[in-house]
Amino acid sequence: SHAKVETDEE
């Protein structure tokens, strides 16, 4: 959702 904030770029 953000650029590598908690590994939630899916």
Swiss-Prot record:
Name of the protein in its database record: Cytochrome c oxidase subunit 5A, mitochondrial
Q: Keyword Transit peptide: yes or no?
A: no
Give the residues annotated as coiled coil: none
Q: Give the encoding gene's name.
A: cox5a
Instruction: Name the protein family.
Output: Belongs to the cytochrome c oxidase subunit 5A family.
The subcellular localization recorded is: Mitochondrion inner membrane
Describe its assembly: Component of the cytochrome c oxidase (complex IV, CIV), a multisubunit enzyme composed of 14 subunits. The complex is composed of a catalytic core of 3 subunits MT-CO1, MT-CO2 and MT-CO3, encoded in the mitochondrial DNA, and 11 supernumerary subunits COX4I, COX5A, COX5B, COX6A, COX6B, COX6C, COX7A, COX7B, COX7C, COX8 and NDUFA4, which are encoded in the nuclear genome.
Stated membrane topology is: Peripheral membrane protein
What are the leading ranks of the lineage? Eukaryota, Metazoa, Chordata, Craniata, Vertebrata
Q: Which UniProt keywords apply?
A: Heme, Iron, Membrane, Metal-binding, Mitochondrion, Mitochondrion inner membrane
Annotated function: Component of the cytochrome c oxidase, the last enzyme in the mitochondrial electron transport chain which drives oxidative phosphorylation. The respiratory chain contains 3 multisubunit complexes succinate dehydrogenase (complex II, CII), ubiquinol-cytochrome c oxidoreductase (cytochrome b-c1 complex, complex III, CIII) and cytochrome c oxidase (complex IV, CIV), that cooperate to transfer electrons derived from NADH and succinate to molecular oxygen, creating an electrochemical gradient over the inner membrane that drives transmembrane transport and the ATP synthase.
| Gene Ontology CC annotation, any one | mitochondrial inner membrane
What's an example GO BP annotation here? oxidative phosphorylation
Transmembrane parts of this sequence: none
Q: Which Cys-Cys disulfides exist here?
A: none
GO molecular function terms listed in the Swiss-Prot or TrEMBL record: metal ion binding
What is the organism field in this record?
A: Oncorhynchus mykiss (Rainbow trout)
Q: Which pathway does it take part in?
A: Energy metabolism; oxidative phosphorylation
